[in-house]
């Protein structure tokens, strides 16, 4: 269990979910794909240019788990690496490095975004999010549409046109009331949305 996973578990629990990790239980109502290291570029037909923390066993496990969830019609929500993974799984590609979206001195960055689709329904059209990534979505996978953008045009959220699949590039699990960064939205609201879709 990677060290960041308790953040996701506590945030999902606060949002009303009963959390299970892969391998603990065969049945589940929805799949959350969490953040982490970069996906190997061979998964989207590219050469390695700028990658950090690649774990090809994790890539394989999560891609297969996503495929199974897709076949079963389970709701899926991706966060940071997770939205990148579901994009790649659906045939999309990634920018291997973007400037201005990484942590600074170990602290999440902040930036303004504009939204539509499911994100706008939750938070409104314009709001601030945290930022802690150096890769980003490039060509979108089959059926995905962008619904949130940073001011530089980087995609911050997607939704599927017909399937229960959503993802965000930012970290709602770090935005819980009480320890979220000043001026950012309450991440529990979007996690509650996901949990509500898993009923």
Cite the ranges covered by each PLM segment.
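Active-site-proximal beta-strand elements of phosphoester/diester hydrolases
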Residues: 166-170
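N-terminal beta1-alpha1 cap of cysteine-dependent amidohydrolase-like domains
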Residues: 1-79, 88-95, 99-123, 128, ...
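Hydrophobic, aromatic-enriched interface-forming segments
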Residues: 83-85
């Amino acid at each position: 269990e990677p060290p960041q996973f308790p953040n996701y578990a506590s945030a999902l629990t606060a949002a009303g979910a009963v959390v299970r990790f892969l391998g603990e239980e065969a049945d589940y109502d929805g799949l959350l794909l969490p953040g982490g290291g970069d996906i190997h570029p061979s998964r989207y037909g590219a050469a390695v240019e700028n990658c950090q923390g690649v774990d090809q066993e994790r890539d394989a496990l999560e891609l297969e788990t996503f495929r199974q969830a897709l076949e079963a019609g389970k709701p899926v929500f991706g966060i940071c690496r997770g939205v990148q993974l579901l994009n790649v799984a659906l045939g999309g590609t990634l920018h291997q490095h973007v400037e201005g979206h990484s942590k600074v001195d170990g602290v999440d960055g902040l930036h303004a975004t504009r939204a539509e689709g499911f994100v706008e329904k939750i938070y409104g059209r314009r709001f601030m999010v945290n930022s802690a990534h150096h890769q980003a979505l490039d060509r979108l996978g089959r059926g995905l549409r962008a619904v949130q953008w940073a001011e530089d045009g980087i995609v911050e959220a997607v939704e599927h046109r017909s399937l229960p699949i959503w993802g965000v590039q930012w970290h709602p699990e770090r935005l819980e009331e009480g320890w979220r960064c000043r001026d950012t939205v309450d991440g529990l609201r979007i996690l509650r949305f996901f949990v509500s879709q898993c009923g």
